[in-house]
């Protein structure tokens, strides 16, 4: 029996097929590499590529379109150039650069693209953000009013930093800039502040040392390290701080507090200059491109203290700048000084004479941190800056004049004692209540008859003594944040008692 062909059935099937026929063709826009050198590829054919768009080379390496010219596109290569040759194809990815953000990154060392480089397995981040974000506007912000304690006496007393501030750390090489930053990170333990350390153009051994120090003090539990080493492509060094600040903004926008350190922006500017010159952009002063100010301003403006409606989170930035032979008037240092809310100036002369941290108190300033300083430390350090300035003046005078009158001699001696008080070994940040006690002791003359050489010993023995005999002093300063009459009386009594036992020893 022959099968009957039903014409209507066939026509129904054909109609269905026609209706469901999908003619969507996936069109990929590709280009060809014209030339490649020094981490930059010139590509022909990517007609509709956007500025800052990600592209992928045949070798699998990613790139970023930075120069859009009439006949070609200048693309910086984010990785190795070895597999990229003239004539190899490049395809658009139709997206801008994003990096992973969130708690999954804490405790990890990542590169500028947020990829792990610490051999601890993949990062399970659930969210990513654009690396280039617009800084928050005026209405979204609130003025800086909460302190960010660094644990360094000279800074917390004289150049206080507030949450949401941008404070520059500036000085020659080997003056302890990174140490100040690392101390600040170590001091955030238990303060609920997430720290991000961005290493730009550093030796890998230096970064490894920093990570080791942070692990040693248990600080990696709340720290992310972003590393673009000296051997990495200039494009990766250029992107590193933006990747770091994007990770920090995530915490700020979720009502949390973050601290970011850029170590250092001088090398960042050099990497950008290298990239710009290879892209044949016109050079300006010191051969930096014309937009090098904008390079740093758009980065540092992203640090802020948000208003209560947006969750009151904060992102504090401590950029580092390396000067050449103390020249603060060079192009990049002046740029960054004008962008930030103050600077901590470190001097090699002070460092070499044994005053460490080598902070020049006269040149260092915090433009907004005063509002964030706790009242107790304000009370004890009120006259400190002036005293130290007068001491420096007298010191210069005393070198030539042999006979000083009694009051000048006393002032000179007290100045020496205060300089000793402000000295501090690296990686040993002090709680704010301890700082208040020792500066109070110096300001009220309790160190006047202690030999300068014994000031460090006096300080080292004072804290355990108060902790054992007068624990309420530390407790009250910690909770009240002010030295009232009651606290002052106990403090005087404690210091007198301690002086008696110290003198006996």
Swiss-Prot record:
Family annotation (InterPro entries): ATP_synth_asu-like_sf, ATP_synth_asu_C, ATP_synth_asu_C_sf, ATP_synth_F1_a_nt-bd_dom, ATP_synth_F1_asu, ATPase_a/bsu_AS, ATPase_F1/V1/A1_a/bsu_N, ATPase_F1/V1/A1_a/bsu_N_sf
Enzyme's top EC category: translocase
Annotated positions binding ATP: 171-178
Reaction catalysed by this enzyme: ATP + H2O + 4 H(+)(in) = ADP + phosphate + 5 H(+)(out)
GO cellular component: plasma membrane; proton-transporting ATP synthase complex
One GO MF term: ADP binding
This enzyme's EC code(s): 7.1.2.2
Keyword Cell membrane: yes
Site features described as Required for activity, chain residue numbers: 364
Keywords: ATP synthesis, ATP-binding, Cell inner membrane, Cell membrane, CF(1), Hydrogen ion transport, Ion transport, Membrane, Nucleotide-binding, Translocase, Transport
Localisation per UniProt entry: Cell inner membrane
Membrane topology type: Peripheral membrane protein
Broad class of where this protein is predominantly found: membrane
PANTHER family, alphabetized: ATP SYNTHASE SUBUNIT ALPHA, MITOCHONDRIAL
Family, as annotated: Belongs to the ATPase alpha/beta chains family.
Record's subunit section: F-type ATPases have 2 components, CF(1) - the catalytic core - and CF(0) - the membrane proton channel. CF(1) has five subunits: alpha(3), beta(3), gamma(1), delta(1), epsilon(1). CF(0) has three main subunits: a(1), b(2) and c(9-12). The alpha and beta chains form an alternating ring which encloses part of the gamma chain. CF(1) is attached to CF(0) by a central stalk formed by the gamma and epsilon chains, while a peripheral stalk is formed by the delta and b chains.
Known role: Produces ATP from ADP in the presence of a proton gradient across the membrane. The alpha chain is a regulatory subunit.
Name of the protein in question: ATP synthase subunit alpha
Primary gene name: atpA
């Amino acid at each position: 029996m022959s099968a009957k062909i039903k014409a209507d059935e066939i026509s129904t099937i054909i109609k269905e097929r026609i209706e469901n026929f999908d003619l969507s063709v996936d069109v990929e826009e590709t280009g060809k590499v014209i030339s490649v050198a020094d981490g930059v590829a010139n590509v022909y054919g990517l007609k509709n590529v956007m500025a800052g768009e990600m592209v992928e080379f045949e070798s699998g390496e990613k790139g970023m379109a930075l120069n859009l010219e009439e006949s070609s596109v200048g693309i910086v290569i984010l990785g190795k150039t070895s597999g990229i040759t003239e004539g190899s194809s490049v395809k658009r990815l139709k997206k801008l650069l994003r990096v992973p953000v969130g708690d999954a990154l804490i405790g990890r060392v990542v590169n500028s693209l947020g990829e792990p480089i610490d051999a601890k397995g993949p990062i399970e981040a659930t969210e990513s953000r654009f690396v280039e974000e617009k800084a928050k506007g005026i209405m979204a912000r609130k003025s800086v009013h909460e302190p960010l304690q660094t644990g360094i006496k000279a800074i917390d007393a004289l150049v206080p930093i507030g949450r949401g501030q941008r404070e520059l750390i500036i000085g020659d090489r080997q003056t302890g800039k990174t140490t100040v930053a690392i101390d600040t990170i170590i001091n955030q333990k238990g303060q609920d502040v997430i720290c991000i350390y961005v290493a730009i153009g550093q030796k890998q051994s230096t970064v490894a040392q920093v990570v080791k120090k942070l692990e040693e003090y248990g600080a990696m539990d709340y720290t992310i390290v972003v590393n673009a080493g000296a051997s990495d492509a200039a494009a990766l060094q250029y992107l590193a701080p933006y990747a770091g600040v994007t990770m920090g903004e995530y915490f700020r926008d979720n009502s949390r507090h973050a601290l970011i350190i850029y170590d250092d922006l001088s090398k960042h500017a050099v990497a950008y200059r290298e990239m710009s010159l290879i892209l044949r952009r016109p050079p300006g002063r010191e051969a930096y491109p014309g937009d090098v100010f904008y390079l740093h301003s758009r980065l540092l403006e992203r640090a802020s203290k948000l208003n209560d409606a947006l969750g009151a989170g904060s992102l504090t930035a401590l950029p580092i700048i390396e000067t050449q032979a103390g020249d603060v008037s060079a192009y990049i240092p002046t740029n960054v000084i004008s962008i930030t809310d103050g600077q901590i100036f470190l001097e090699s002369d002070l460092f070499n004479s044994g005053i460490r941290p080598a902070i020049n108190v006269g040149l260092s300033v915090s433009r907004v941190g005063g509002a964030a300083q706790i009242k107790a430390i304000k009370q004890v350090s009120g006259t400190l800056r002036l005293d130290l300035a007068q001491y420096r003046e007298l010191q210069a005078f005393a070198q030539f004049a042999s006979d000083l009158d009694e009051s000048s001699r006393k002032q000179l001696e007290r100045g020496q004692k205060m300089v000793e008080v402000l000295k501090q070994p690296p990686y040993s940040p002090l709680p704010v209540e301890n700082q208040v006690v020792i500066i109070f002791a110096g300001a009220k003359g309790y160190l006047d008859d202690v030999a300068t050489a014994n000031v460090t010993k006096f300080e080292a023995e004072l804290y355990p003594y108060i902790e054992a005999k007068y624990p309420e002093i530390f407790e009250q300063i910690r909770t009240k944040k002010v030295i009232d009459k009651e606290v002052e009386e106990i403090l005087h009594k404690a210091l007198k008692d301690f002086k008696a036992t110290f003198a006996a020893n």
